Amino acid sequence: MSALANHAFAKMNGIGNEIVVVDMRDSTAKVTPDDARAVASAQGGVPYDQLMVLQKPRLDGTEAFISIYNNDGSEAGACGNGMRCVVRRIFEKTGQATATFETAAGLLNAWQGPAPDLYTVDMGVPKFGWQDIPLAEEFRDTRYIELQIGPIDNPILHSPSVVSMGNPHAIFWVDDVNAYDLARFGPLLENHPIFPERANITLAHIVDRDHITIRTWERGAGLTRACGSAACATAVAAARLKRAERNVEITLPGGKLGIEWRERDDHVLMTGTATFEYEGNFDPALFAPAG
């Protein structure tokens, strides 16, 4: 039987990014990709974009090791909106105002934001090297790379900026983020051979130097109302191109995030809300073998 059968969970969202938080710090059992897919089942499951699993801390001074799953069962290195949901959950239960977590992408520090309903997560230092993103071939300058869809002489989307925020991101600069069928183009670009680990695909419009609008096709989850790491990647990419300041507001379909690419150490700070929806226990039938 799955470790998640009958296990408690919290359904939350980070500005529209659907999140399920499961605290398994008192267990040695492991969640499998099959478990993660079962949770999102249309037959009695809990719809989500990311599943955040808290496991026993492996390092002194950390609250937990966070395993992050997309709804297709694949693992993610980072999820900014999910981390804010975890932070709210921990802070409300313990009364803390600061915490450190370990993820596959490294250590993340978090703290209470400038207002009671805001939470800030230090998403770490972005990476720009083609091997770090990673890309399947060498690009010396990742501010733009040669990639397009559509006719060669009249491409529909082209020349994205690429960034790693612990997961790979490609940002296409457009005049109107709603003018493109992202549900059609997103999976084609996510699975393009240039991205050996697939990629998150974002359409971004720079409104002015401190405001950017985006839509994202999320790797392993699909079209989403919000992707925190995509907001971070977009802010960083725009600043690298000197088209935006290092402290910007990002508008997503689900809401707004404040992103600061801190100049003194290049860490990316993400500030936004985290909304609690309901609690429950997983139905064991979700994890029963088919047949």
Swiss-Prot record:
Homodimer. GO terms for biological process: lysine biosynthetic process via diaminopimelate. Pathway: Amino-acid biosynthesis; L-lysine biosynthesis via DAP pathway; DL-2,6-diaminopimelate from LL-2,6-diaminopimelate: step 1/1. SUPFAM superfamilies: Diaminopimelate epimerase-like. Catalyzes the stereoinversion of LL-2,6-diaminopimelate (L,L-DAP) to meso-diaminopimelate (meso-DAP), a precursor of L-lysine and an essential component of the bacterial peptidoglycan. The active site is at 79 (proton donor), 227 (proton acceptor). Belongs to the diaminopimelate epimerase family. It catalyses: (2S,6S)-2,6-diaminopimelate = meso-2,6-diaminopimelate. Its EC number is 5.1.1.7. It comes from the Bacteria. The keyword rRNA processing does not apply. It is found in: Cytoplasm. The record marks 169, 218 as: Could be important to modulate the pK values of the two catalytic cysteine residues. NCBIfam families: DapF. Gene3D superfamilies: Diaminopimelate Epimerase, Chain A, domain 1. Transmembrane segments: none annotated. Substrate binds at residues 17, 50, 70, 80-81, 167, 200, 218-219, 228-229. It is an enzyme of class 5 (isomerase). GO terms for molecular function: diaminopimelate epimerase activity. It holds the Pfam family DAP_epimerase. This is Diaminopimelate epimerase. GO terms for cellular component: cytosol. Keywords: Amino-acid biosynthesis, Cytoplasm, Isomerase, Lysine biosynthesis. Its main location: cytoplasm.
